Amino acid sequence: MTAPTAIRRLNAADPDFAHHLDHLLSWESVSDDSVNQRVLDIIKAVRERGDAALVEFTQKFDGLEVASMADLILPRERLELALTRITVAQREALEKAAARVRSYHEKQKQDSWSYTEADGTVLGQKVTPLDRAGLYVPGGKASYPSSVLMNAIPAKVAGVTEVVMVVPTPRGEVNELVLAAACIAGVDRVFTIGGAQAVAALAYGTESVPQVDKVVGPGNIYVATAKRHVFGQVGIDMIAGPSEILVVCDGQTDPDWIAMDLFSQAEHDEDAQAILVSPDAEFLDKVAASIDKLLPTMDRATIIETSINGRGALIHVRDMAQAIEVANRIAPEHLELSVADPQAWLPQIRHAGAIFMGRHTSEALGDYCAGPNHVLPTSGTARFSSPLGVYDFQKRSSIIFCSEAGASELGKTASILARGESLSAHARSAEYRIKDDVKGN
């Protein structure tokens, strides 16, 4: 008989609850000086030696015999071939998911705007897509085609001219679903490179890999470290932490459903976090029993158990109002409101990457095909960050057009402020445009 899981139990009424909650939520990515130095060395090599460095690192890290960079380029025809190599059901699922993701993100598009003042001055904002975006996709059999859709489609909807995907093929392992997803999502170019060297190539460009304006997509510690180092040279989406789910339940949902919802994030990796908050203590016991019952049936039981025991929790609260307070304190990546009337509580939710409303809305639907993006802020960063979206691939420029009368009137204000800052060139630049009949100073 399998031993019961050791998931921690917390009670919001305990005087030291805040301390225990802080301890539960604390997570720091591995800080490894040796990794940092290796990444810096790799970036330096790619900047100095370009394609030659990429070929060398691919041979070294991916175990491939590569004669030249030409061996690391996948033509569009190869992506189209992948569509024929997956099952009909898989292709239909990818196409349906892509259509829903595209439809949702179309609603996020921002348009340029302007307005004209009485004197003819025009002020506005010009929205422009990035020229080129780079998408990092983890390689091998563990890569996720859904991530290709979630990263590439918003870029294409935004109007990005070229989306460049990098995906390693360790020991020659090619994930046909990933390539098929790239084809459906409209990825323009694909290079079978990975690791810090791929991030460096996207950020600085090589003879074959074009330089991009922004790098998005998940990866291991080498990829994350490389993204930190190239930020500023290019934009990045985020440095993501472990996956998280917080379920707020009134105690009326099937406990097996809730246990499986917790598993859906815990199975990602040992550092993933799954938390249930409820005012019903007996319900927490029922979910604990469901966890013990269902865990042995899971393909990734060992990973789930490590995650649940190490970073999971069942939290008892006074009432639903306190449950919402705890949710806002945690600011989770995924928040399920598994309650009778989720709409009533929605206005009180301030911090969450994605909010799943009602008992029938499992987090897994958002991961794959609901439509909203599954690239979400983690580790409490939902306090100030948002899901990946079309706006991440667009930039805004301010538009200012001054009529003669407008320049004259604004010039008087600018002159006073500039001289107050002892910036006389600023002042005189504005003063030159003040009409003669109103100067007099």
UniProtKB/Swiss-Prot annotation:
Biological pathway: Amino-acid biosynthesis; L-histidine biosynthesis; L-histidine from 5-phospho-alpha-D-ribose 1-diphosphate: step 9/9
Ligand binding (Zn(2+)): 265, 268, 367, 426
Entry similarity comment: Belongs to the histidinol dehydrogenase family.
Record's protein name: Histidinol dehydrogenase
Function: Catalyzes the sequential NAD-dependent oxidations of L-histidinol to L-histidinaldehyde and then to L-histidine.
Residues binding NAD(+): 136, 197, 220
Cofactor: how bound: Binds 1 zinc ion per subunit.
GO cellular component labels: cytosol
EC number(s) on file: 1.1.1.23
Gene name of this polypeptide: hisD
Gene3D superfamilies linked: 1.20.5.1300, Nitrogenase molybdenum iron protein domain
Reactions catalysed: L-histidinol + 2 NAD(+) + H2O = L-histidine + 2 NADH + 3 H(+)
Biological processes annotated in GO: L-histidine biosynthetic process
Binding positions for substrate per the UniProt entry: 243, 265, 268, 334, 367, 421, 426
Molecular-function GO terms, alphabetical: histidinol dehydrogenase activity; NAD binding; zinc ion binding
Active site feature: 333-334
Cofactor(s), by name: Zn(2+)
Keyword Electron transport (UniProt): no
InterPro entries (alphabetical): Ald_DH/histidinol_DH, Histidinol_DH_CS, Histidinol_DH_monofunct, Hstdl_DH
UniProt organism field: Pseudomonas fluorescens (strain Pf0-1)
Cited Pfam families: Histidinol_dh
